[in-house]
């Protein structure tokens, strides 16, 4: 399946053009973060070897690690049963969270 065919499987309509992308560590399976992807950021992710997201606050694409050097190298991408969420397993270089923590999910509620 080519990249366009892979993108067309996904239902972007439910999220107003965005889908949630759960990022997990490839080896430990720890959830590192949740980001949102547009068709364009997903295409860039599928074309390369690092993750791209759509920033809802800045309203633009961003490559995770482009500023910090904490890139997420893609190992595997899976889609959920409703075709509206993806799970990306990565080899995380450095911290995934902007706070410097390995995971964005480090606080108890």
From Swiss-Prot:
Pfam families: PRA-CH. It catalyses: 1-(5-phospho-beta-D-ribosyl)-5'-AMP + H2O = 1-(5-phospho-beta-D-ribosyl)-5-[(5-phospho-beta-D-ribosylamino)methylideneamino]imidazole-4-carboxamide. SUPFAM superfamilies: HisI-like (SSF141734). It is an enzyme of class 3 (hydrolase). Mg(2+) binds at residues 80, 82, 84. Its cofactor is Mg(2+); Zn(2+). GO terms for molecular function: magnesium ion binding; phosphoribosyl-AMP cyclohydrolase activity; zinc ion binding. It is found in: Cytoplasm. GO terms for biological process: L-histidine biosynthetic process. Its EC number is 3.5.4.19. Pathway: Amino-acid biosynthesis; L-histidine biosynthesis; L-histidine from 5-phospho-alpha-D-ribose 1-diphosphate: step 3/9. Transmembrane segments: none annotated. Keywords: Amino-acid biosynthesis, Cytoplasm, Histidine biosynthesis, Hydrolase, Magnesium, Metal-binding, Zinc. GO terms for cellular component: cytoplasm. Zn(2+) binds at residues 81, 97, 104. Belongs to the PRA-CH family. Catalyzes the hydrolysis of the adenine ring of phosphoribosyl-AMP. Homodimer. This is Phosphoribosyl-AMP cyclohydrolase.
